[in-house]
A protein has these predicted regions:
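Glycine-rich phosphate/pyrophosphate-binding loop regions near the starts of catalytic domains
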Residues: 1-135
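Conserved small/polar residues in nucleotide/adenosyl-binding loops
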Residues: 139-149
Length: 149
């Protein structure tokens, strides 16, 4: 139904008249020093792609790149932060993939579903449309804090 050519937040595959699968992958480098917080932020970011399409997440896979010298406690904290956000979203984490990399990165591949008639697309917005923000972006708060100092 939707692929990369539409620039939407996730790919959508119509399974039948009442169900479409929604799939996304998102990861980035740390924007905070605390590993648990980093896991929470990265997971929320990946999950937001599913929610942006009007879908409900079901399952997620971890994507973790970390220098082995940082130790397993850092990896565990990142993964626990991610798992916490996934559980809060009503989904679960089922494995994933880790690699040794000098530059830390974390994110998720998330699978969800939506009624194909209720998909929210990123095209079609017009000047004058109302935009509801339900939370303040943590990224924006951190940027503001950085600019203040």
């Amino acid at each position: 139904m939707l692929g990369y050519e539409t620039n939407d937040d996730a790919a959508v595959w119509k399974i039948n008249d009442s169900t479409a699968a929604v799939l996304t992958v998102d990861f980035f480098t740390p924007i905070v020093d605390d590993p648990y917080e980093f896991g929470c932020i990265a997971a929320a970011n990946a999950l937001s792609d599913i929610f942006a399409m009007g879908a409900q997440p079901h399952i997620a896979l971890n994507l973790l790149a970390l220098d082995a010298s940082l130790g397993s406690s850092v990896a565990s904290a990142i993964l626990e932060g991610g798992a916490t956000k996934v559980r809060e979203a009503g989904a679960f984490v089922s494995g994933g993939h880790t690699i040794d990399d000098p530059e830390p990165k974390y994110g998720l591949c998330v699978f969800g579903s939506v009624d194909p008639h209720r998909i929210i697309r990123n095209k079609g917005a017009q000047a004058g449309d109302v935009l509801y923000l339900t939370t303040v972006s943590y990224t924006h708060l951190r940027a503001h804090e950085t600019l203040r100092h």
